[in-house]
Amino acid sequence: MGLPWYRVHTVVLNDPGRLLSVHIMHTALVSGWAGSMALYELAVFDPSDPVLDPMWRQGMFVIPFMTRLGITNSWGGWSITGGTITNPGLWSYEGVAGAHIMFSGLCFLAAIWHWVYWDLEIFCDERTGKPSLDLPKIFGIHLFLSGLACFGFGAFHVTGLYGPGIWVSDPYGLTGKVQSVSPAWGAEGFDPFVPGGIASHHIAAGTLGILAGLFHLSVRPPQRLYKGLRMGNIETVLSSSIAAVFFAAFVVAGTMWYGSATTPIELFGPTRYQWDQGYFQQEIYRRVGNGLSENLSLSEAWSKIPEKLAFYDYIGNNPAKGGLFRAGSMDNGDGIAVGWLGHPVFRDNEGRELFVRRMPTFFETFPVVLVDGDGIVRADVPFRRAESKYSVEQVGVTVEFYGGELNGVSYSDPATVKKYARRAQLGEIFELDRATLKSDGVFRSSPRGWFTFGHASFALLFFFGHIWHGARTLFRDVFAGIDPDLDAQVEFGTFQKLGDPTTRRQVV
């Protein structure tokens, strides 16, 4: 037929059987990819340290999505929360991956069947004898079925009525586990960080979808609306479907990047705004303050800080620190975290406590500046030593560690103090193993960053596709130069310009 690459889909334009076939094959490819990707990730995933080497540090992409829906165990005998298990059951990570691959195979066979047996009676219009689809009726069927699935997910899976529940955690990502969730029917259900809103919104949206589906099955569209929106044209379906997909892609890009109950930080890593706002740092200082008020020493108060919380307060876990074109997991960048060295407290020769100014997200390098409790600069690592007034040597800065591996250790030699001041710019200080994976020391993004980038990019692309196909279907007569309701047969190629009244026509 010699079609250009961007017009190859015209081969299924007036062929409902094969249109169905290629969509089933597409589902087979998507499901097959999901299952295969899950098996690949399981082959390379190391579950041994859920605190310092969680799935998001290892660049896992599909494992977090399975986990948030209630899968936590592996046939390998491990659980995502740590420890070993004896009977993971069918719905383990491998079980879900296998189910997707089996479903992919069945879809593959169904696609071949529908490609071979394309001329089915169901696709034939009784009045004309030509292949056609009752698109408003199909819309009603799909709306009803998707509403049913949506309602079922919210009412049964999420609530734990018949299903595992979903991943729920505290605001600081420390106590996450899979549990059943009760629907939140009040104003709190609209808070994106309240898990109960997931159940209530799915129940509400599912109910609406079921009712709307029944409506579209029982009520025919008015003729003027049918013609105005070109409801008989398959390209209208394409255009409106693309609209639904790009809208959803924009929404999930937002919920992923800004964070929500659907994207827990234990599974996808923290957001960049948690670093920008000092979110974890404030919580750490609050806990230390509480410890001191209970008459604990500084060392004891810092030792009670969970390593998991300290690890979130490290710039290397900020998804905005990795470049879009730096391939690989976070572990391939700054290395595998081995242990927390402890919290460094700097003091000058007058005994004032100094705080290292932290690096903002979009800086690769940043001057080392130490300020006191009032924000006054007291020490720095100068660019020009000849003109320096506040250098570590001149001010006599010392550092002492509280909590972590270096608990109680102090240093006063300037070279070591400057080393830890530079590292304190990046948040809490961790020992990182860069040898195992040959990590290059350049920060990478987390799956949160990749998901957002991918979905925002495709949403923009699909937005253009919606405009393109919507315009094609609405203005088809203008583009073709033919009135769609024309009774007379037009002889193509004989008129001078579009709409020329002298065009020769032959009445049918």
UniProtKB/Swiss-Prot annotation:
Subcellular location(s) of the protein: Plastid, Chloroplast thylakoid membrane
Pfam families according to UniProt: PSII
Transmembrane segments: 21-36, 101-115, 140-156, 203-218, 237-252, 457-472
Principal place of residence: plastid
Free-text remark on how the cofactor is bound: Binds multiple chlorophylls. PSII binds additional chlorophylls, carotenoids and specific lipids.
Membrane-topology annotation of the record: Multi-pass membrane protein
Recorded family membership: Belongs to the PsbB/PsbC family. PsbB subfamily.
Molecular function (Gene Ontology), one example: chlorophyll binding
Subunit structure: PSII is composed of 1 copy each of membrane proteins PsbA, PsbB, PsbC, PsbD, PsbE, PsbF, PsbH, PsbI, PsbJ, PsbK, PsbL, PsbM, PsbT, PsbX, PsbY, PsbZ, Psb30/Ycf12, at least 3 peripheral proteins of the oxygen-evolving complex and a large number of cofactors. It forms dimeric complexes.
HAMAP family: PSII_PsbB_CP47
GO terms for biological process, alphabetical: photosynthetic electron transport in photosystem II
Name of the protein described by the UniProt record: Photosystem II CP47 reaction center protein
One Gene Ontology term, aspect cellular component: chloroplast thylakoid membrane
Keywords from the UniProt entry: Chlorophyll, Chloroplast, Chromophore, Membrane, Photosynthesis, Photosystem II, Plastid, Thylakoid, Transmembrane, Transmembrane helix
Native source organism of the sequence: Ceratophyllum demersum
Domain of life: Eukaryota
Keyword GTP-binding: no
Task performed by this protein: One of the components of the core complex of photosystem II (PSII). It binds chlorophyll and helps catalyze the primary light-induced photochemical processes of PSII. PSII is a light-driven water:plastoquinone oxidoreductase, using light energy to abstract electrons from H(2)O, generating O(2) and a proton gradient subsequently used for ATP formation.
InterPro entries per record: PS_antenna-like, PS_II_antenna-like_sf, PSII_PsbB
